[in-house]
Every structure is written in C-alpha cells, then in structure tokens.
Design a protein with these regions (language model features):
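Conserved catalytic/acceptor-binding region of the Class I
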Residues: 20, 31-107, 123, 132
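Core SAM-dependent methyltransferase catalytic element
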Residues: 86-89, 110-113, 122, 160-171
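A short acidic, Gly/Pro-enriched loop at the edge of an enzyme's catalytic core
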Residues: 1-7
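Short catalytic micro-motifs in class I SAM-dependent methyltransferases
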Residues: 11-14
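C-terminal helical/coil "lid" or tail adjacent to the Rossmann-like core of SAM-dependent
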Residues: 90-154
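A short, conserved alpha-helix within the catalytic core of class I
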Residues: 16-26
C-alpha cells in the first residue's frame, strides 16, 4: 500500500476485466503525492488502433454478457467515475490526447499486421474467429489495407500514428 511514486500502465490495464478494481488498485499502491499515469486507446477515433479494433471486432463473436469495453478507458467521463469511486477528486484527474507512433524502418505494413496477428490479444482473437469462419484472408487483407492507409513512412518502412488518451491522476 502507498508504495510507489508512480504507477503507470500504457495500453495494458485498460484491458483488465474489472475497471473499477483497476482504478482502486492503482490508487491503493501509489503513495500520497504520487501519480497514476495511463495511456488508453480512444473509442471511435479515426486513428489506427481504434480502426484496427473496429475491424477486428467485425470478425469476432459478440462479447459475453456483462462485458465492459476496454475502450471506455479512453473516455474522460468514465475515467473520472472510476477514479472517483477510488476516492480521487475530479480536480486531481487530467487527460490529454497524445500520439503514439509505431515506427520501424525495416518493416512493411504487412509485417506490422503479422506482428499484431501473433502478439496483440484483440487481433489474435479476431484471426482465431475468422479462421473458424473461413474469413482469415479477408481479415488479413482488410487490416493490411488499413495499415497501408495510415502509414506515413515516405521511404519504405512503417510509421503509423495512433491517438491515445493520456491520463494523469495526482494523489
């Protein structure tokens, strides 16, 4: 309890199944005067990750009853509610839109999607579901086209921006 000066989760804790517990635990382990910092993807954003998740969900089965979308961590009102229930006042919570850039000079957009296919839970699940329906190639083509559309690299490689919500909670 109250052990850390900084508790940070970048695109991680947002995927935990019980968001109010996540906020409470992050507050619990952070000392008074410390900070909780999160980076969370934003729902319905036109940037890459939000669109990748939209495409992936179209190939996935519906979520189970009671499922709370991790994308709600990208909505300020939900953040305020979650940390508020953990005892944090609204004035101690700030959010800003920031950009994360996926950049690799030695990779193509197709390589990039292949990495997401193997290592990123939402796309792994979408590919598993698409394979069962014989639509794996459709999903792959759609995601590669999306990566190519968002790729800003001028001389080959990958440079894909993705907007996220930076959350700072001062305790």
């Amino acid at each position: 309890d109250a052990s850390f000066d900084l508790t940070m989760s970048i695109f991680g804790a947002m995927f935990a199944p019980r968001p109010f517990d996540v906020a409470r635990e992050m507050v619990r382990v952070t000392r008074p005067g410390g900070r909780v910092v999160m980076g969370n993807w934003i729902p319905n954003d036109p940037s890459f990750i939000s669109q990748l998740l939209r495409v992936s969900s179209a190939f996935s089965p519906p979520p189970p009853e009671g499922f709370i979308s991790p994308m709600l961590w990208g909505v300020e009102d939900h953040i305020v509610e979650r940390f508020g229930k953990a005892g944090v006042e609204r004035a101690s919570i700030s959010t800003t839109r920031e950009t994360f850039r996926f950049a690799r000079a030695d990779r193509t957009p197709a390589d990039f999607i292949e990495a997401f296919r193997r290592f990123y839970g939402p796309t792994m699940n979408a590919f598993e579901a698409a394979e069962k329906n014989g639509r794996q190639d459709d999903l792959y083509r759609e995601l590669v086209a999306l990566a190519e559309e968002h790729n800003e690299a001028k001389d080959g490689g990958v440079s894909i921006p993705a907007t996220f919500l930076k959350v700072t909670v001062c305790l």
